[in-house]
C-alpha cells in the first residue's frame, strides 16, 4: 500500500484510471483499528479515542469521502475469527462521528444496526442515514417492512434503505462450490471443471457421492431455500420449487437431483441459496416506498460465491417489463437520480444540459441479465463469477463510450468522485 490516510487512498484509485466513476465511504473498522489497535475488536473506546476517530473521519471527508460506513453484523469476521472492529461499538461512538459527517452533508451508512441506533444517528446534526434492509418473504412482510421504514423516518429523520432486487446469498454448482462434506465429495472438489464433469458421469462415483450426501449433517445449507437457476440464457429467479421439492417430484434424493441437473446443463447449472429477497412479490411491496432504493448486492466481494451484478437488468426486466411494479421512468429514477441524491452527487443522475453524461442506451423490450459463469482470471488463477447482459447498446461514462454492444471498449474515462 502507498497510502495511510483516506485522501491518499483516493489518489491511488485515481492513478489506476478506473473505467467507471467511483466514490467512497471511509470505513469504521479501519479507523477504529488505526486508533485503538487490537483493543478495537472487543473493547469500548475512551472519550479521547472517540474524538480521535471523529477527527480522522473529518479529515477523510475533507479529502473526498462521501461519508462514513460501519458494520455491526456479527457474522462478518476478521481472519482470526473475531467480529470486525466496530461491531460492538457504543452508539455514542457513532454519534460522535456523525457530528462531523452530518454538517458536511455526508452519508452515514450502516449494516446490521438496530432501529434505535439508526434513529440516534439520524437525529445527530441532521445526519443522512443509509442502511441495508429487506423482508422475511412471508405473506405481508413487504408491506410490514415498508411501514416500519416509514415510522423510522418520522420526526424529520432522513433514513434511506437499500435492498436486493432478487434472491441472493450463495451460488453453488459443479463449476464452483460443492454442497456436501465427505471424502468422495472432497475428491470431486479437488478436480478441475473438466475432471468434475467427467466424474459425475461415472455411475459408481455418483453412487458414492449420493451415499455420502445421505449421511446426517453432510450438508449445512438449508436446501428448502435453494433454487435451480435453470437452463435458459437468463437465470430463473422466480421459480417456485426449491431443490427439495424438485427432488420429491422426480422421486430422487436431493443430491441425485443436483447431480442430474449438473449433468444436463453440462456442469454449468447453478443453484442459488436465497438468503435474502426470496419472495419477489413481497420485495415489490417493499419497493413501493420512495425512501427505499434498489441496489444492495455483492459484486466485488465473495467473488466465487455471489454474483449480484445483474440486479439493475433484473429491475428492468422483472419489475418493469414482466410485472409492471414500476413504470420504466420510475425504475430509471430509482436507479439513477435517487441514488445520486442519497450519495450527495448533485451533478449527475438526470439527463439535463450541464449534468454529467453518464448514460446507458438499452432496449426495454430486450434487456435482461444472463447466467453467471465462473472464470479463473484472478492472481494465481483464483476463481470469480462474471455476469453479462443482453439488450444494452452502450454505456457512456463522462461522455465516452465505455461498453459497446455488451463488450468493454479500451476507454477508461471513469473518475474518483470526491465530496
Question: Model-derived features: where do they sit?
Answer:
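Acidic, glycine-enriched loop/beta-strand segments at the rims
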Residues: 269-283, 327-332, 340-374
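C-terminal cap of metal-dependent C-N hydrolases
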Residues: 285-292, 309-311, 361-407, 411-413
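Core domains of carbohydrate- and sulfate-ester-processing enzymes
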Residues: 2-7
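Active-site proximal loops enriched in glycine and acidic residues that flank catalytic Cys/His/Asp
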Residues: 72, 112, 133-135, 163-165, ...
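Divalent metal-coordination and catalytic microenvironments
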Residues: 22, 64, 162, 251, ...
Amino acid at each position: 500500500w502507498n497510502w495511510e490516510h483516506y485522501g491518499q487512498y483516493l489518489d491511488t484509485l485515481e492513478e489506476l484510471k478506473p473505467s467507471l466513476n467511483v466514490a467512497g465511504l471511509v470505513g469504521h473498522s479501519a479507523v477504529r483499528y488505526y486508533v485503538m489497535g487490537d483493543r478495537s475488536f472487543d473493547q469500548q473506546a475512551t472519550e479521547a479515542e472517540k474524538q480521535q476517530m471523529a477527527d480522522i473521519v473529518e479529515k477523510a471527508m475533507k479529502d473526498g469521502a462521501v461519508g462514513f460506513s460501519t458494520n455491526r453484523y456479527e457474522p462478518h469476521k476478521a481472519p482470526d475469527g473475531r467480529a470486525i472492529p466496530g461491531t460492538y461499538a457504543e452508539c455514542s461512538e457513532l454519534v460522535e462521528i456523525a457530528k462531523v459527517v452530518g454538517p458536511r452533508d455526508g452519508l452515514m451508512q450502516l449494516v446490521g444496526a438496530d432501529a434505535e441506533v439508526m434513529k440516534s444517528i439520524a437525529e445527530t446534526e441532521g445526519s443522512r442515514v443509509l442502511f441495508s434492509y429487506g423482508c422475511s418473504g412471508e405473506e405481508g412482510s413487504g408491506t410490514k417492512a415498508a411501514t416500519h421504514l416509514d415510522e423510522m423516518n418520522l420526526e424529520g429523520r432522513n433514513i434511506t434503505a437499500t435492498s436486493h432486487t432478487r434472491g441472493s446469498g450463495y451460488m453453488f454448482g459443479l463449476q464452483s462450490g460443492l454442497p456436501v462434506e465427505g471424502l468422495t465429495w472432497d475428491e470431486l472438489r479437488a478436480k478441475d471443471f473438466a475432471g468434475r464433469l467427467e466424474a459425475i458421469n461415472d455411475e459408481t462415483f455418483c453412487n458414492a457421492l449420493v451415499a455420502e450426501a445421505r449421511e446426517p449433517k453432510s450438508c449445512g445449507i438449508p436446501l428448502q431455500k435453494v433454487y435451480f437457476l435453470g437452463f435458459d440464457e437468463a437465470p430463473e429467479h422466480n421459480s417456485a420449487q426449491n431443490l427439495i421439492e424438485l427432488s420429491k417430484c422426480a422421486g430422487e434424493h436431493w443430491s441425485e437431483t443436483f447431480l442430474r441437473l449438473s449433468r444436463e446443463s453440462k456442469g454449468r447449472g447453478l443453484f442459488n441459496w436465497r438468503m435474502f429477497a426470496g419472495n419477489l412479490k413481497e420485495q415489490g411491496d417493499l419497493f413501493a416506498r420512495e425512501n427505499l432504493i434498489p441496489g444492495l448486492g455483492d459484486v466485488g466481494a465473495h467473488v466465487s460465491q455471489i454474483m449480484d451484478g445483474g440486479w439493475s437488468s433484473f429491475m428492468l426486466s422483472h419489475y418493469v417489463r414482466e410485472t409492471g411494479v414500476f413504470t420504466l421512468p420510475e425504475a430509471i429514477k430509482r436507479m439513477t437520480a435517487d441514488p445520486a441524491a442519497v450519495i450527495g452527487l448533485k451533478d449527475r443522475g438526470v439527463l439535463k444540459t450541464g449534468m454529467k453524461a453518464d448514460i446507458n442506451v438499452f432496449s426495454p423490450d430486450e434487456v435482461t441479465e444472463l447466467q453467471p459463469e465462473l472464470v479463473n482470471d484472478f492472481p494465481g488463477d483464483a476463481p470469480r463469477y462474471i455476469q453479462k447482459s443482453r439488450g444494452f447498446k452502450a454505456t457512456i461514462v463522462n461522455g465516452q463510450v465505455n461498453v459497446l454492444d455488451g463488450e468493454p471498449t479500451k476507454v477508461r474515462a471513469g473518475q474518483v468522485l470526491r465530496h
